[in-house]
Amino acid sequence: YVLLIAFAILISAGVYAWLKTYVPREPLNCPDGVSIFVKEAGFNSSTGQLIVTVRNNGRFNTAGYFIYVSNNSAQKNPSIEISNYLQEDEQTVKFGNSVLLSLTGDNSFSPGDERINVFNLSTGMGELFSIRIIPTRFQEEENKKRFVSCGNAGVQQIIGEPGMCTSQCTGK
């Protein structure tokens, strides 16, 4: 009987360890107060050039953003991902499907900072209607840097209209 009980305990410990890997972990989230504001977005349909001015109006540094556009006024959420069309410069690079605002791969886009980014889109895309930007950050978990999307801090704006600044636009 002792061997039978020991064998049952051993199997239950193994099953527990195996099932523990199936339990979802808490996802990494950005801190409250992360925010990027689209100050201006202008599109020239003849050249296919989209110029976006973003400003960090939050309380924390960010690393960059995901960017989506729509070319249909009936589409509520922009879904065309355009980071691959980024015109890279000495401060801005592509990072996967996002735009990284630092060559060092850190959260260097400080509150109050502004950046102008140019996207050279194909002229066959048509007229763009709206833009959506979702901030990104590098968060540290278990001594590892993880790239995190701040989906709850995303902003959307109609292209060609100036962004509306609130009292939080100062970054304070």
For the regions a protein language model found, what residue spans apply to each?
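N-terminal single-pass transmembrane signal-anchor helix
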Residues: 1-22
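N-terminal export/assembly leader peptides and their processing motifs that target proteins to secretory
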Residues: 18-172
